[in-house]
């Protein structure tokens, strides 16, 4: 069916008033390009579930797309013989609460018991609920840190991890088999609530989650003197983060007022990503005013955490790699000192995260495992330990994109856990007369200076994906002989499935002091290049990264 015919069918069948008005406002001639974009395909479903711009159309996030995806998920649970129970959480985004309720209605109509959080909660609380109730799946309605125009639908497996590629393919097939209008079962929310096929998640589940997070503490000293500024960036983090901080005695917490309450329009922060300085500007201003020891920011679904710390006359933003290394070293040091370091400890990070983690791991005798990009792969490593009866070996996992997890209580990155650890670590270093900036500099002195940078190359136009593929093919066929003035000594092609990892379209180039990893975005025509350099000073490491970037940009024609 053509995009135009699909548009006409939706115009005739859509009952939602807002979506009907949106479709009615389109003119078949004047708005032909927009109709094509809205209806030329179904919104893609992958390991990250669905994510797209809100609006009417098969290529948009709306109630009909969500219902159809849920119908496919219900069919998958039955076909796979998984428990017919599904936990549901949602964030502060536009439409999230409604999408969560519609998800519950479709599940209940298909005989799947839906456990729904009664209010917005962090993504890690969803991962926890899946395991708490023994569910076959979980759904979190969120688009993470995308702009306000987006929403999404993340699916989790029975282990509390985002679903595998194989599971995503199976769910996708069931979704494609269901018609948006005639192929979806739906029941009354009130009736399903009355008969128990929809159940509201109780406070006992959330309390148990916070208990599990609190048990990740590795120091019981006084934290009351720590002064913290916190911004949930108008997302889900306020309640859980402030509750966990109160539990461990961090009581001097000032919220950024304009960003304290849920608001899916993100009025003060168009791109609510704690990796970006712009997202933390209001927090930085308040931190300067209150002379805070620490600024924390969590993204809308509270699975990523950014931080800034005093450094001289101003504040310094710690990168995801720096925070990962700080937390890793702190956990190793504290658990070694208090006698709780497990035998044969395991830490996990991704292939694009800093090599400094290897130096920390070697120093403390920790086995460091590296996975493909995406925290679900870190969660899978915890699952492997669990199946071997060795869950206690898991010490810490992190990725460069601001995701951290210090326990097996959930299987996704957890900013509630990260906030607890970061505050505790800052309080502990305070007793040593050090700020976190000074602590990071001390680690650089101890392990060497590591610089990490990310470059995104957007290949616009209709042939963007093809050009991206051609660039990677050319790099594989003829990789550069030198980078940053050094000979390339190693080329690793993850397409062949290196180190026991699944085959992935990733290429790694190494010299004596520099590393470049190239991979496609996966969802858009964008190449991502991760630069890493190790040197005697940060200036030298930065110069190596800059030189490698110039070389690769020239190779890519940038």
Feature map (PLM): residue ranges:
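Short acidic, glycine/serine/threonine-rich loops at helix termini
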Residues: 97-102, 127-131, 149-155, 176, ...
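Gly/Ser/Thr-enriched, mixed-charge loops and adjacent short helices
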Residues: 10, 14, 18, 34-43, ...
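An N-terminal, well-structured beta->alpha segment
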Residues: 5-103, 198-226, 236
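Phosphate-binding and adjacent anionic-ligand microenvironments
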Residues: 288, 292-294, 314, 334-519, ...
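N-terminal small/polar loop signature for handling phosphorylated ligands or for N-terminal nucleophile
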Residues: 87-150, 247-307
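Conserved phosphate/anionic-ligand binding catalytic regions in large, soluble enzymes, centered on
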Residues: 39-59, 143-146, 232-244, 300, ...
């Amino acid at each position: 069916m053509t995009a135009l015919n699909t548009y006409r069918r939706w115009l005739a069948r859509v009952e939602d008033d807002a979506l009907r008005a949106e479709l009615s406002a389109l003119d078949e001639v004047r708005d032909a390009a927009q109709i094509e974009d809205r209806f030329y395909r179904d919104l893609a479903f992958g390991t990250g579930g669905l994510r797209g711009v809100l609006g009417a159309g098969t290529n948009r996030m709306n109630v009909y797309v969500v219902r159809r995806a849920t119908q496919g998920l219900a069919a998958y649970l039955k076909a796979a013989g998984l428990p017919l129970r599904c936990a549901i959480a949602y964030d502060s985004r536009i439409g999230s609460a409604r999408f969560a309720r519609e998800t519950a209605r479709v599940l209940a109509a298909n005989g799947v018991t839906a456990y729904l959080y009664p209010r917005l909660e962090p993504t890690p609380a969803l991962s926890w609920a899946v395991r708490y109730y023994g569910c076959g799946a979980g759904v979190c309605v969120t688009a993470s840190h995308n702009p306000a125009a987006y929403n999404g639908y993340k699916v989790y497996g029975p282990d509390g991890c985002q679903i595998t590629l194989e599971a995503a393919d199976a769910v996708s097939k069931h979704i494609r088999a269901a018609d948006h209008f005639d192929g979806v079962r739906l029941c009354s929310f009130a009736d399903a609530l009355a008969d128990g096929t929809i159940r509201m998640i109780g406070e006992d589940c959330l309390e148990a989650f916070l208990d599990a997070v609190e048990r990740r503490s590795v120091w019981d000293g006084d934290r009351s003197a720590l002064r913290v500024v916190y911004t949930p960036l108008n997302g889900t983090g306020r309640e859980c983060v402030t509750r966990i901080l109160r539990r461990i005695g961090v009581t001097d917490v000032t919220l950024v007022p304009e960003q304290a309450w849920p608001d899916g329009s993100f009025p003060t922060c168009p791109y609510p990503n704690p990796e970006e300085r712009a997202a933390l500007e209001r927090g930085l201003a308040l931190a300067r005013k209150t002379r805070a020891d620490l600024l924390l920011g969590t993204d809308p679904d509270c699975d990523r955490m950014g931080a800034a710390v005093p450094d001289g006359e101003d504040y310094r933003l710690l990168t995801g790699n720096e925070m990962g290394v700080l937390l890793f070293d702190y956990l190793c040091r504290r658990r070694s000192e208090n006698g709780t370091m497990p035998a044969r400890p395991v830490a996990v990070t991704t292939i694009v995260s800093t090599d400094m983690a290897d130096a920390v791991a070697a120093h403390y005798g920790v086995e460091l495992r590296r996975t493909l990009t995406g925290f679900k792969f870190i969660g899978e490593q915890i699952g492997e330990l669990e199946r071997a009866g060795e869950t206690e070996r898991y010490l810490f996992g992190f990725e460069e994109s601001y995701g951290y997890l210090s326990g097996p209580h959930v299987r996704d990155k957890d900013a509630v856990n990260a906030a607890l650890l970061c505050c505790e670590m800052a309080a502990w270093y305070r007793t040593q007369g050090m700020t976190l900036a000074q602590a990071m500099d001390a680690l650089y002195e101890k392990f060497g200076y590591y610089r990490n940078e990310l470059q995104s190359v957007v290949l616009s136009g209709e042939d963007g994906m093809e050009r991206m593929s051609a660039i990677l093919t050319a790099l594989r066929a003829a990789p550069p002989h030198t980078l940053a003035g050094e000979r390339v000594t190693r080329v690793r092609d993850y397409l062949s499935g290196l180190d026991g990892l699944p085959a992935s379209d990733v290429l790694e180039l190494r010299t004596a002091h520099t590393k470049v990893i190239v991979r496609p975005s996966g969802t858009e025509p964008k190449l991502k290049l991760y630069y890493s350099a190790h040197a005697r000073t940060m200036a030298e490491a930065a110069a190596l990264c800059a030189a490698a970037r110039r070389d690769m940009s020239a190779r890519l024609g940038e």
